[in-house]
């Protein structure tokens, strides 16, 4: 291996790193900061909804009176629980899912990015949801 080959490989690696940095910093500029914030909020809401749903499904096979406390990070959004549907919607996103168990009707408005405490209680025929 000659000295020239090492420096060529170094230059190629350096240019690849430079291209990666330029592309990653261009993304908010191309799509706009607002679009990037919407995508981040939607992703966060999807993760929170998925965590709540999986805990509801686990609780649905538990005995009556079982209780779970779930903490999720939520973007500014409206949370709606109705029949077997959970819906989270906010600025630029609308995500919903269905569960295998009935839910009590409950609405909650998260006015800012915060950690929600979701209280889940298994009743005789449904799961009661309360958010604090």
From Swiss-Prot:
Location(s), subcellular: Secreted; Cell surface; Fimbrium
Keywords, A to Z, come to: Fimbrium, Secreted
- Propeptide positions, renumbered to this chain? 1-4
The UniProt PTM text for this protein says: The N-terminus is probably cleaved by the prepilin peptidase EppA, which recognizes the class III signal sequence.
Report the superkingdom from the record. Archaea
A cellular-component GO term for this protein: extracellular region
Please give the knockout or disruption phenotype noted for this protein: Deletion of the gene leads to completely nonpiliated cells.
Q: Which Pfam family, any one, appears in the UniProt record? A: Class_IIIsignal
* Record keyword Repeat present: no
Q: Where is the signal peptide?
A: none
Q: Where is this motif: QXSXEXXXL?
A: 9-19
Identify the InterPro entries for this entry: Class3_signal_pept_motif
- Present the record's domain note: Contains an amino terminal motif QXSXEXXXL, which is part of a class III signal sequence.
Free-text function comment from the UniProt entry: Minor component of the type IV-like pili. Essential for pili formation.
- This one is known as Minor structural pilin EpdB
């Amino acid at each position: 291996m000659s000295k020239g080959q090492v420096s060529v490989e170094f230059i190629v690696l350096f240019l690849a790193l430079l291209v990666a940095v330029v592309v990653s910093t261009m993304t908010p500029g191309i799509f706009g900061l607002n679009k990037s914030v919407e995508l981040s909020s939607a992703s966060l809401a999807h993760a929170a909804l998925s965590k709540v749903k999986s805990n509801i499904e686990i609780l649905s096979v538990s005995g009556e009176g079982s209780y779970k406390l779930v903490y999720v990070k939520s973007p500014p959004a409206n949370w709606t629980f109705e029949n077997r549907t959970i819906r989270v919607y906010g600025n630029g996103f609308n995500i919903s899912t269905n569960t295998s168990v009935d839910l009590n009707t409950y609405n909650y408005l998260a006015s800012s990015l915060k950690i929600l405490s979701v209280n889940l209680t298994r009743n005789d025929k449904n799961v009661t949801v309360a958010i604090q």
